[in-house]
Amino acid sequence: MTAIRDARPSDRGAILAVTLAAYEQYAAALAPPLWAMYRQNIQATLADVRPAAQIVAEEGGALVGTVLLFPAGAGMANPGGKPVTLEWPEVRLLAVPPAARGKGVARRLMEECIRRARAAGAPALTLHTADIMSVAMRLYERMGFARAVELDFSPAPGIVAKGYKLPLTLPSPQRGEG
């Protein structure tokens, strides 16, 4: 059974390994300098996740997924973009490595982010994704996230980080949908 929990300091190495394994598939879709920049950004983000909650999925003592949930009001710098203060909580770096996919791990991590954002009284939850992340985009849309073009930014020439937003005034997505 997969358990969803807050990360522990001892999880740090496994979180980096799981995240890089999950995102490695995008290396082939990006020009080498862009992939190097993206990989470096992932590593820098994971080196100090504050003020985000680092949430993990664990199965049989091994991490099989991870996600960051930044609180509303957090100040951040989007890669290649201007510094922003988050109006709503934001999901970042949802990661499930290939060997753990197809088991609902990503959905469970997203459901936990939604639960926590609602518990904090947030009116919405946001995230960014890109066209190369089509499987993730379908999951987000099935869970009720809708495009929020006003949140888009460009981390590099020709790349658009697409904003998505989930209003939290709606009922929770039902388990098993999608």
Name what the model sees in each region.
Residues P9-R12, L16-P98, M110-E112, R116, ...:
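Acetyl-CoA-dependent GNAT
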Residues L86-W88, P123-T126, A130-S172:
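C-terminal "cap" of GNAT-fold acetyltransferases
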Residues L93-E111, A120, D131-R138, R142-M143:
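Conserved glycine-rich acetyl-CoA-binding loop
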Residues R175-E177:
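Glycine-biased, low-complexity coil/linker segments
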